[in-house]
């Protein structure tokens, strides 16, 4: 995990350095948000709607619709006791993600499409369970609403995390996030 964080930090630094040289007018934004994390597919059979949190660094160029965003995500999906059982297990999913964003033109409200991928770390809240890293992707829609020097954003993304069949197979969830960019 330390190697992964070190590599992600180096890549982020290189991306910022390269974009600084390549483009004159850069725009940066830090985003913080939270909301609901909704399990879908097979995951909805064992987990209930939980909560999500997001911290992000968005990098773009003025007057260009394409940008990049690096996200740190945290999702907690409470266990839903299957029929006939009395036990349930929470699932915690964190991630370090890189995304491309295409923002449509607008004045104070700008819709956007976001797509990306990265490393997800999942751990069931069970004694002896170990956290494991998996690759996954995400795609979604959102909108930013300018409020003076700040922006409010609302987005929904579909996350698909690829696990080995022995670990339970692929799972999906959809966070709906409301946040602030500054």
Could you describe each region identified by the protein language model?
Residues 1-27:
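Cleavable N-terminal export/targeting peptides
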Residues 34-38, 74-76, 159:
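Generic short beta-strand segments
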Residues 37-54, 132-133:
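Surface-exposed strand-loop-strand hairpins of Gram-negative outer-membrane beta-barrel proteins
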Residues 37-40, 82-83, 122-125, 160-162:
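Extracytoplasmic loops and strand-loop junctions of Gram-negative outer membrane beta-barrel proteins
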Residues 53-127, 134-137, 145-148, 174-182:
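Gram-negative (and chloroplast) outer-membrane scaffold detector with strong preference
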């Amino acid at each position: 995990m330390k190697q992964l964080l070190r590599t992600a930090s180096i890549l982020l630094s290189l991306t910022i350095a390269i974009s600084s040289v390549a483009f004159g007018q850069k725009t940066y934004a830090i985003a913080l948000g939270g909301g609901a994390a909704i399990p879908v597919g097979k995951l909805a059979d064992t987990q209930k709607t939980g909560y999500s949190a997001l911290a992000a660094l968005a990098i773009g160029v003025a007057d260009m619709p394409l940008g990049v965003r690096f996200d740190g995500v945290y999702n907690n999906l409470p266990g839903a006791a299957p029929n006939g059982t009395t036990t349930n297990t929470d699932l915690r999913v964190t991630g370090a993600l890189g995304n491309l964003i295409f923002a449509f033109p607008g004045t104070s409200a700008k819709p956007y499409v976001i797509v990306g991928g990265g490393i997800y770390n999942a751990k069931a809240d069970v004694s002896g369970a170990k956290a494991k890293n998996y690759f996954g992707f995400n795609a979604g829609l959102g909108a930013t609403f300018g409020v003076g020097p700040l922006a409010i954003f609302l987005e929904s993304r579909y996350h698909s995390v690829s696990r080995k069949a022995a670990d339970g197979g692929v799972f999906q969830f959809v966070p709906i996030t409301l946040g602030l960019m500054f």
